[in-house]
Amino acid sequence: MQFERISTEQKKLSLIQTFLHQNALKLDEQIEYFVVGYNDNEQIVVCGGLAGNIIKCVAIDESLRGSGVALQLITELVDLAYTLKRPHLFIYTKPEYATLFKSCGFYIISDANPYVVLLENSATRLQKQCSLWEKMRVDGNRIGSIVMNANPFTLGHRYLIEQALQQCDHLHLFIVGEDASQFSYTERFEMIQQGIFDLSNITLHSGSDYIISRATFPNYFLKDQLITDESYFEIDLKLFRLHIAQALGITHRFVGTELNCPVTAEYNRQMHYWLMDAEMNAPKINVIEIPRKTASNHIISASTVRKHLAEKNWAQLAEFVPMTTLNYLQKCGRF
């Protein structure tokens, strides 16, 4: 079979989209490259895409299923990823297709049955990462954690961190690693690093592929947005409780209350269930919701900060972010 690598800027994208629709899939807009395979009539019969380090939109013509062409396709996609220096790969798929990808060298690391399973191309990488986290473990009765995007870092983020530190012996701070925000991962990490420089008893972790970003979670094979969101919540929170929290000895997770975004509010509710109530082979984690900090009678949020930044409302911006963020934005030419 002849394979071809296609960037999403090429005209052939419409043919790929048609083929995906024929296989009950939608085109995922985050895909940067496709690998497609043609039959003797130069018709697309297999395809798969690469978005960052996630393989997406794998489709195989019904006539070729079970023929071994899936292994050829995945091999081509893995070769492409290695060429792009992306050796650590993930696949989200329906549970009924997990066996297919396991035969291609992928291993299940989390699931949201009966809708989604998450696989990666290593049998030991997650275990090795947990071993690294175990070396960062800090003794204490109350070990806290926060996961944040910080797009950008605001006084609200700083307040949440301060409140958490008052309630625990040590705090682990995780940053969502994907570059799917207005500010890049590097920018967000540096703003947080500068914004907490004066605080002690805190470990700032670099971005991890095992902190799942909602922005990169696929929805191309799930028809219902509610099911997509709930599957994301489950996969992300189970990874956190079963692996990250166990390795670091985390006992508490802190989060700001959410009044404006229904999806984030539901994530907070699901957090109580998956971290505290659900029965699984891992200690329960106490979820603590901290009321959001306000400025001028308005809740401080990163979205409001981005709005002030876009509208060049410098005075209002200064009320919502610490001086370290202001200095960083100015240094980077954001205002």
Curated annotation (Swiss-Prot):
Annotated keywords: ATP-binding, Ligase, Nucleotide-binding
EC number in record: 6.2.1.22
Role: Acetylation of prosthetic group (2-(5''-phosphoribosyl)-3'-dephosphocoenzyme-A) of the gamma subunit of citrate lyase.
Protein name: [Citrate [pro-3S]-lyase] ligase
Higher taxonomy: Bacteria, Pseudomonadati, Pseudomonadota, Gammaproteobacteria, Pasteurellales
Coiled-coil spans in chain: none
GO biological process per UniProt: biosynthetic process
Residue ranges of every copy of the N-acetyltransferase domain listed in the record: 1-131
Annotated S-S bridges: none
Highest taxon of source: Bacteria
NCBIfam families according to UniProt: cit_ly_ligase, cyt_tran_rel
Keyword Lyase: no
One MF annotation (Gene Ontology) recorded for this entry: acyltransferase activity, transferring groups other than amino-acyl groups
Catalysed reaction, written as an equation: holo-[citrate lyase ACP] + acetate + ATP = acetyl-[citrate lyase ACP] + AMP + diphosphate
Gene name per UniProt: citC
